[in-house]
Amino acid sequence: MSPLISAASVLAAGLAVGLASIGPGIGQGTAAGQAVEGIARQPEAEGKIRGTLLLSLAFMEALTIYGLVVALALLFANPFVS
């Protein structure tokens, strides 16, 4: 394996995980903050807000997991190496 391809694969794997984590991290922080604010304003809707929050957090976390899968594919099943 060429050292250039190996170095580029490691760099791309790091970028994949890093960039895939930025958006969901910001979104999860915003969603959790808004959920806490909503529960503080309307305590009787806590169950519905919490359920919606957990579902949306799971969908946001899936985006980070996709980035991790791409990174693992680049590191261990590199398609650029013959």
Swiss-Prot record:
<keyword id="KW-0375">Hydrogen ion transport</keyword>
<dbReference type="InterPro" id="IPR000454">
    <property type="entry name" value="ATP_synth_F0_csu"/>
</dbReference>
<comment type="subunit">
    <text>F-type ATPases have 2 components, F(1) - the catalytic core - and F(0) - the membrane proton channel. F(1) has five subunits: alpha(3), beta(3), gamma(1), delta(1), epsilon(1). F(0) has four main subunits: a(1), b(1), b'(1) and c(10-14). The alpha and beta chains form an alternating ring which encloses part of the gamma chain. F(1) is attached to F(0) by a central stalk formed by the gamma and epsilon chains, while a peripheral stalk is formed by the delta, b and b' chains.</text>
</comment>
<keyword id="KW-0066">ATP synthesis</keyword>
<dbReference type="InterPro" id="IPR005953">
    <property type="entry name" value="ATP_synth_csu_bac/chlpt"/>
</dbReference>
<feature type="site" description="Reversibly protonated during proton transport">
    <location>
        <position position="61"/>
    </location>
</feature>
<dbReference type="InterPro" id="IPR020537">
    <property type="entry name" value="ATP_synth_F0_csu_DDCD_BS"/>
</dbReference>
<protein>
    <recommendedName>
        <fullName>ATP synthase subunit c, chloroplastic</fullName>
    </recommendedName>
</protein>
<keyword id="KW-0472">Membrane</keyword>
<dbReference type="GO" id="GO:0009535">
    <property type="term" value="C:chloroplast thylakoid membrane"/>
</dbReference>
<feature type="transmembrane region" description="Helical">
    <location>
        <begin position="57"/>
        <end position="77"/>
    </location>
</feature>
<dbReference type="InterPro" id="IPR002379">
    <property type="entry name" value="ATPase_proteolipid_c-like_dom"/>
</dbReference>
<dbReference type="GO" id="GO:0046933">
    <property type="term" value="F:proton-transporting ATP synthase activity, rotational mechanism"/>
</dbReference>
<comment type="function">
    <text>Key component of the F(0) channel; it plays a direct role in translocation across the membrane. A homomeric c-ring of between 10-14 subunits forms the central stalk rotor element with the F(1) delta and epsilon subunits.</text>
</comment>
<feature type="transmembrane region" description="Helical">
    <location>
        <begin position="7"/>
        <end position="27"/>
    </location>
</feature>
<dbReference type="GO" id="GO:0008289">
    <property type="term" value="F:lipid binding"/>
</dbReference>
<keyword id="KW-0138">CF(0)</keyword>
<dbReference type="GO" id="GO:0033177">
    <property type="term" value="C:proton-transporting two-sector ATPase complex, proton-transporting domain"/>
</dbReference>
<keyword id="KW-0406">Ion transport</keyword>
<dbReference type="InterPro" id="IPR035921">
    <property type="entry name" value="F/V-ATP_Csub_sf"/>
</dbReference>
<comment type="function">
    <text>F(1)F(0) ATP synthase produces ATP from ADP in the presence of a proton or sodium gradient. F-type ATPases consist of two structural domains, F(1) containing the extramembraneous catalytic core and F(0) containing the membrane proton channel, linked together by a central stalk and a peripheral stalk. During catalysis, ATP synthesis in the catalytic domain of F(1) is coupled via a rotary mechanism of the central stalk subunits to proton translocation.</text>
</comment>
<keyword id="KW-0812">Transmembrane</keyword>
<keyword id="KW-1133">Transmembrane helix</keyword>
<keyword id="KW-0150">Chloroplast</keyword>
<dbReference type="InterPro" id="IPR038662">
    <property type="entry name" value="ATP_synth_F0_csu_sf"/>
</dbReference>
<dbReference type="Pfam" id="PF00137">
    <property type="entry name" value="ATP-synt_C"/>
</dbReference>
<comment type="similarity">
    <text>Belongs to the ATPase C chain family.</text>
</comment>
<dbReference type="GO" id="GO:0045259">
    <property type="term" value="C:proton-transporting ATP synthase complex"/>
</dbReference>
<keyword id="KW-0446">Lipid-binding</keyword>
<keyword id="KW-0934">Plastid</keyword>
<keyword id="KW-0813">Transport</keyword>
<keyword id="KW-0793">Thylakoid</keyword>
